[in-house]
């Protein structure tokens, strides 16, 4: 009787000891049935969201026995994927870029990052130094607003530096008559040419960089070029007398067009109404044969006659030119007693 009771007790203990194992096996089968047909890539995509909204969709996936731990993990990841910055950036892009008020500076409230100021509100690393009002009024024109600052990139150009460099003369800004504007190409001045570069007028005329241009006509003008400097309307008589009274040989001369003499270059208004060869009237709808631009003919025969005449005239002119050249050569040989000299 005791053996039977011991057997029953042993069986009962075995039964109670194997019950948790069976429940674990059943739970394992349940979990495997839930994730049946899933590949490893699906789990990786579930743990790699592409936007902050994917956390809610994939929050139900995971170990059902570790729900609290998975929620804490998702909360930590969601904190690193904070969407507050994205929203503020979108709102800031809708703000007018021309609004430069200091109150419009947006600072992102993030404890893990530093304050960020957008580039549209930044102008320079250091504040520009404004000039004093009387100094700018003395150097700048009247139509310029006082306290103006020239700003290029991150550097501030002072008007005083421009004056020292010589790019803008203060007399020009003040409205004086004697002024000079310097640049890399040319200089236009109304000053005395005798004091240019410390040289005299004779040295300037002998130099290869000197050129004198004289314009004749109703408004005569003499222009002197010396290097990169241009001098107009020189009033000194000494330079005018030496330069403009044919004491020096000019390189070339361009005569102005005399518009007072009639020039027969335009055809008559009715040149299409008659034949240029036989003077026959040309009616409407008839064939017209043109030659030399403004000569109209009634037939091709009349036009060919005119072409032959022009060719004979051209040949005669060439023969006369050849005869004149040969006669001049003979006369030169006679004067030189049979000795022909060449230049070179």
Swiss-Prot record:
The keyword Cytoplasm applies. Early expressed in hypocotyl and cotyledon and preferentially in the stelar region of the shoot and root. Later expressed in root-shoot junction, lateral root, old or senescing leaves and in pistil and pollen of flower buds or open flowers. InterPro entries: FLZ10/11, Zf-FLZ_dom. It is found in: Cytoplasm; Nucleus; Endoplasmic reticulum. Induction: Up-regulated in response to mild as well as prolonged energy depletion. Up-regulated by the glycolysis inhibitor 2DG. Induced by NaCl. Induced by abscissic acid (ABA). Residues 309-320 have a biased composition (Acidic residues). One of its GO terms (cellular component) is endoplasmic reticulum. A zinc finger (FLZ-type) spans 270-314. May act as an adapter to facilitate the interaction of SnRK1 complex with effector proteins, conferring tissue- and stimulus-type specific differences in the SnRK1 regulation pathway. Negatively regulates KIN10 leading to a repression of the SnRK1 signaling pathway. This is FCS-Like Zinc finger 10. It comes from Arabidopsis thaliana (Mouse-ear cress).
């Amino acid at each position: 009787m005791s053996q039977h009771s011991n057997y029953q007790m042993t069986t009962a203990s075995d039964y109670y000891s194997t019950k948790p194992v069976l429940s674990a096996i059943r739970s394992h089968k349940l979990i495997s049935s839930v994730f049946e047909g899933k590949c490893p890539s699906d789990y990786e995509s579930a743990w790699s969201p592409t936007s902050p909204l994917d956390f809610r969709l994939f929050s139900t996936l995971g170990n059902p026995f570790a729900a609290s731990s998975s929620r804490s993990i998702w909360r930590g990841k969601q904190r690193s994927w904070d969407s507050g910055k994205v929203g503020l950036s979108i709102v800031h892009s809708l703000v007018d870029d021309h609004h430069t008020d200091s109150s419009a500076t947006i600072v992102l409230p993030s404890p893990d990052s530093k304050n960020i100021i957008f580039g549209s509100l930044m102008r320079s690393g250091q504040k520009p130094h404004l000039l004093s009002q009387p100094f700018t009024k003395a150097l700048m024109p009247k139509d310029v607003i006082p306290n103006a600052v020239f700003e290029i990139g991150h550097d501030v150009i002072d008007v005083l530096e421009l004056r020292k460099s010589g790019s803008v003369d203060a007399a020009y800004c003040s409205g004086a008559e004697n002024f000079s504007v310097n640049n890399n190409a040319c200089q236009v001045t109304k000053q005395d040419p005798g004091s240019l570069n410390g040289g005299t007028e004779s040295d300037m005329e002998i130099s290869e960089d000197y050129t004198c241009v004289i314009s004749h006509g109703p408004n005569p003008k003499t222009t002197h070029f010396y290097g990169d400097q241009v001098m107009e309307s020189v009033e000194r008589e000494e330079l005018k007398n030496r330069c403009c009274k044919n004491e020096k040989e000019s390189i070339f001369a361009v005569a102005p067009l005399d518009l007072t003499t009639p020039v027969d270059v335009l055809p008559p208004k009715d040149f299409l109404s008659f034949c240029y060869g036989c003077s026959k009237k040309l009616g409407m709808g008839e064939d017209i044969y043109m030659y030399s631009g403004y000569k109209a003919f009634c037939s091709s025969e009349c036009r060919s006659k005119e072409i032959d005449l022009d060719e004979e005239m051209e040949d005669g002119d060439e023969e006369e030119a050849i005869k004149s050249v040969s006669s001049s050569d003979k006369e030169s040989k006679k004067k030189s007693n049979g000795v022909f000299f060449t230049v070179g």
